[in-house]
Swiss-Prot record:
It is found in: Virion. Belongs to the helicase family. VETF subfamily. GO terms for molecular function: ATP binding; DNA binding; helicase activity; hydrolase activity. This is Early transcription factor 70 kDa subunit. Acts with RNA polymerase to initiate transcription from early gene promoters. Is recruited by the RPO-associated protein of 94 kDa (RAP94) to form the early transcription complex, which also contains the core RNA polymerase. ETF heterodimer binds to early gene promoters. It is an enzyme of class 3 (hydrolase). InterPro entries: Helicase_ATP-bd, P-loop_NTPase, SNF2_N, SNF2_RAD54_helicase_repair. GO terms for cellular component: virion component. PROSITE patterns: HELICASE_ATP_BIND_1. The keyword DNA-binding applies. Heterodimer of a 70 kDa and a 82 kDa subunit. Part of the early transcription complex composed of ETF, RAP94, and the DNA-directed RNA polymerase. PANTHER family: DNA EXCISION REPAIR PROTEIN ERCC-6-RELATED, SNF2/RAD54 FAMILY MEMBER. It comes from Melanoplus sanguinipes entomopoxvirus. Pfam families: SNF2-rel_dom.
């Protein structure tokens, strides 16, 4: 990052609701311009989730489009549509009259890229060379890059790098999201170095969390990645701080332990005894959410829903639906019982986002439970025994009309079916000001697709009914809701609950004691490392006795603690520069200074804005700054003024003034006065 830009723009803050390039974003643009565009190197943007990697990438793509072609790879088509729409919003932050070539910016998805290059081939070496060579001199930007590490997609990217002159910009808030194996992909995607796994990684066992980078590996990272990483993780003072609630704190977070009923515990133990190596098996995730009887009911769920049968007393399948008193008593699900008890005793609590990962079984049981308890599905018929947003089950709002609670479920199935417009429509309704308190849609149940790119507004509670695969995925979900523009009041109380289905005395005394010791803030790094090693041994020894949810959360947090070694290396490899600004970045900097000055001032002298722009610059740019200011005024750069709103700048005699942009409508034409 460029230190001059970073420190200068921090001095002249403007409200975050106005269009602008934030200080760290413009400072990162300089980094990308120097390393990727000028030096033709691959780089990693390790920026905290919610810090604006999207806008940085789009601005850089627009600037780079003058010189080269850019390919942006997104997780799915729905997210790709969002990026494409934001491309034109980003253009308004620059000078619209510059000779950008937006035709040089291409978008694709991970699956499309795989299909295009691999087709039906399973062997990466069989890819036709011409298919790779077309990416010569491309800058390839990869969103959520950590999802490419350690799989076939990552191998494909490495193959492209080895057989073309393409360079990468990797975007991630969590480079090592699952295992230390990610380091191999990071090194090979950023450099021409081959990462010899057995040489640089040592293992204390066959569990993923038992692997660690050795001293040789640390030296390799320092030697090869210095200057190729941009790190940003500044605490935001303009957003609410999430409040984690729970009845016990593990290594990182408080969690809610939800003891299973005897019915659910017996069902859990039966399935667990029939399942080998059940740590990351989807089956146990489903069993931890809801008791459905025999193992075949989980593995052949479609057949179960097509039948008419009793699963437990007071719990049946009939005509493709779950029915019975158990949907209300909820002995079948300790997590749903805790969740329902909370929402049915909390009037006017606002909007909730509820994360769950088991889309088929999860969607079906959640829908059945919500409807049985009086909460209607959005855009469907209102249930007879509805629960009111304001008075809950009383349905007596002081002679006012009651508002039925409603929910909606969004999973990757909608995206896979191509229903991106449906997802965008639902989220648009959910985020509207009229739904600020949840009167239109109160509950949004979402899977991982929400965590990847969508933004949620005015969320008051975030629930996790299934344990995310990694700590970074958990943080992504939270970051999608807690953003600078998502709340009118930064002091809004936002509660986060991670729910774990547990059995009695789930945590052994030894593991509990280590966790308590680890929380001691006075511990040295060496003492923490020793405790982590001890914790690792206990996890291995007691793993089989721990309930699935608790085990998975402990593994996730433990892996996160182990990954801090590599993270700290990455952080230290990120450097601040004081370089002279390249013309592309100097233009962006000048426009941003004009934008900030024009927020407070609607009329000013040329000499005043020049003085304001130059005051912290350490290099002499001769006449460039004045020439660019004149150019931008003549071109009518768009700004935002606190009195007049959206404006453009223009000359009035010898002064620079802001002129309001006014939309004018008649029966034939929507135009604007510019």
């Amino acid at each position: 990052m460029n230190k001059i830009i970073l420190e200068d723009l921090k001095e002249s803050n403007v409200p975050l609701y106005i269009p602008q390039i934030l200080p760290h974003q413009l400072a990162t643009l300089d980094f990308l311009n120097e390393r990727s565009l000028k030096e033709k190197k691959s780089v990693l943007l390790f920026h905290k989730m919610g810090s604006g990697k999207t806008i940085i990438s789009l601005l850089f793509s627009i600037i780079a489009s003058i010189e080269t072609k850019i390919l942006i790879i997104l997780p799915n088509t729905s997210i790709m549509d969002i990026w494409i729409s934001k491309l034109y919003d980003s253009l308004l932050l620059l000078n619209k009259n510059d000779k950008y070539n937006l035709n040089n910016i291409e978008f694709t998805t991970r699956s499309r890229l795989n299909e295009e290059l691999l087709g039906t081939n399973k062997n990466i070496n069989d890819i036709i060379t011409e298919n790779i060579k077309k990416y010569d001199n491309y800058i390839i930007i990869i969103d959520e890059a950590h999802n490419f590490f350690g799989n076939a997609s990552g191998e494909l990217l490495i193959h492209i790098k080895q057989n073309s002159t393409a360079r990468y910009v990797l975007l991630t808030g969590s480079p090592i999201s699952n295992t230390i194996e990610s380091l191999k992909d990071i090194v090979e995607l950023l450099t021409n170095e081959t990462f010899e796994y057995n040489k640089y990684i040592e293992s204390a066992g066959n569990k993923v969390f038992q692997q660690r980078i050795n001293k040789q590996g640390i030296e390799l990272l320092k030697n090869k990645l210095t200057g190729l990483i941009s790190y940003y993780d500044e605490d935001r003072k303009d957003i609410p701080s999430p409040i984690f609630q729970g009845n016990i704190k593990l290594l990182n977070y408080p969690v809610v332990l939800c003891p299973m009923s005897k019915l659910q515990e017996d069902n859990y133990n039966m399935i667990s005894n029939q399942t080998e190596n059940d740590m990351f098996i989807k089956l146990m995730m489903n069993v931890s959410l809801v008791a459905l009887g025999d193992k075949e009911n989980y593995t052949n769920f479609d057949l179960l829903m097509a039948s008419n049968k009793q699963i437990f007393p007071n719990f049946y399948v009939s005509n493709g639906k779950f029915i019975g008193q158990e949907l209300i008593d909820l002995n079948i699900s300790s997590k749903l019982k805790y969740f329902m008890n909370s929402i049915l005793t909390s009037p006017n609590a606002g909007k909730r986002f509820i994360y769950f990962a088991n889309s088929t079984i999860g969607s079906t049981i959640i829908r059945s439970v919500m409807i049985a308890n009086g909460i209607s599905e959005y855009d469907k018929e209102i249930v007879n025994n509805f629960v009111c947003v304001n008075c809950l089950k009383e349905r007596n709002c002081n002679n006012k009309e009651c508002i039925p609670m409603k929910f909606v479920i969004i999973t990757s199935k909608e995206s896979n079916k191509g229903n991106n417009s449906y997802i965008n429509k639902i989220l648009s309704v959910f985020n509207e000001d009229v739904n600020e308190n949840g009167s239109v849609i109160m509950f949004l149940f979402g899977s991982r697709i929400i965590a990847e790119a969508y933004t949620l507004k005015d969320i008051k509670e975030i629930w996790f009914l299934t344990v995310p695969e990694t700590k970074s995925e958990l943080e992504q979900c939270i970051a999608r809701a807690i953003r600078s523009f998502a709340y009118k009041d930064k002091n809004t109380r936002v509660v986060v609950r991670i729910c774990l289905a547990t059995t009695p005395n789930a945590l052994s005394n030894e593991i509990s004691q280590i966790i308590e010791k680890y929380k001691d803030e006075s511990l040295s790094d060496e003492e923490k490392t020793l405790l982590l090693n001890k914790f690792e041994m206990k996890l291995v020894n007691y793993a089989i006795d721990l309930p699935y949810d608790l085990r998975k959360q402990l593994y996730s947090e433990f892996k996160s603690e182990k990954a801090k070694v590599a993270y700290n290396i990455f952080i230290n490899l990120s450097i601040l520069t004081n370089n002279i600004l390249n013309d592309n970045i100097l233009k962006c900097f000048i426009i941003e200074k004009i934008r900030r000055y024009s927020y407070e001032n609607s009329r000013y002298k040329l000499k005043d804005i020049l003085s304001y722009i130059k005051k912290n610059l350490k290099f002499d740019y001769k006449n460039k700054i004045e020439d660019y200011v004149n150019e931008f005024v003549n071109d009518g750069v768009v700004v935002y003024n606190k009195s007049f709103g959206t404006c453009y700048i223009d000359w009035f005699k010898d002064d620079i003034v802001v002129k309001q942009i006014i939309l004018e409508f008649n029966n034939y034409l929507l135009s604007y006065n510019y």
